[in-house]
Amino acid sequence: GNHATHNIRKEDEIIKVENDAVSSLEAAFAIIAAMSLGGVRKLEIEIGESAMVMGQGILGLFATQFCRLNGAYPVIAVDLNADRRNLALELGADYALDPRDADFPVKVKELTRGKGVSACVEVTGVSAALNQALECAAYMGRISLLGCTRVSDTVIDYYRQVHRPGIRLIGAHNFVRPKFESYPHHWTNRDDCLAILDLIAAKRILVSPIITKIASPAEAPALYKSLCEDEDFPIGVVFDWKKL
């Protein structure tokens, strides 16, 4: 956001939280959860299709829950961190795998009757993870590129991994969405946020387990420093502005 004490926003950019069942701390995650939901929508998941989410940070944990809500089975969560894998299981993943395992692609195939995953959300933005996603994809599978893969430091065999098996790579940047009217698989940011608030109120998606620290805004400098330097930085940190 801006380095300012006040922001002037357009009226249609403001979303009022009208349901008392949604706390202000939970509502704070609606915008980032909408990024995940947009990436999952573009996969057009059908009931019973397998799905995999590469990376279980905040975006990945929401994507995992949305894959499950879309009727995907099994939902496979992937992360290097054991705590994040366990949290993904708590939030509804059917399996959680470590991508460093030598037989990682084999395990994915075993969990999907030898086919590979039909739908995958790549959240990490690491090109090596995209390469692994391609190795695990089913024939004519889809991969949603939710993470920003800015550095192409891994060789991808586009004929063998993309062209020949008919894989669809889908750009899922949050800005690539309709501005005024939603349509199937492509909702406006506002409509996605409203849907997420409804799902939080109905306990269809869970936010509280993702919140690992509630901090005063006065702690911001130290927290941002830790974010840059600490590999084990908490997943979900929320500023409680009432603590000022």
Language-model features: locations:
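Glycine-rich phosphate/adenylate-binding loop and adjacent beta-alpha elements
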Residues: 1-15
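Short, glycine/polar-rich helix-capping loops at beta-to-alpha or helix-loop-helix junctions
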Residues: 2-5, 79-87, 154-157
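Glycine/charged-rich beta-loop-alpha catalytic/anionic-binding loops adjacent to active sites
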Residues: 12-25, 115
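Mid-domain Rossmann-like dinucleotide-binding core that forms the NAD(H)/NADP(H) cofactor-binding site
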Residues: 19-20, 25-102, 106
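Glycine-rich cofactor phosphate-binding loops and adjacent beta1-alpha1 units
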Residues: 43-45, 91-170
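Short beta-strand "acidic-cap" motif of Rossmann-like dinucleotide-binding folds
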Residues: 75-79, 145, 172
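C-terminal substrate-binding/catalytic core of Rossmann-like NAD(P)-dependent dehydrogenases/reductases
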Residues: 109-110, 157-211, 222
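C-terminal capping/lid region of NAD(P)-dependent oxidoreductase domains
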Residues: 114, 144, 151, 155, ...
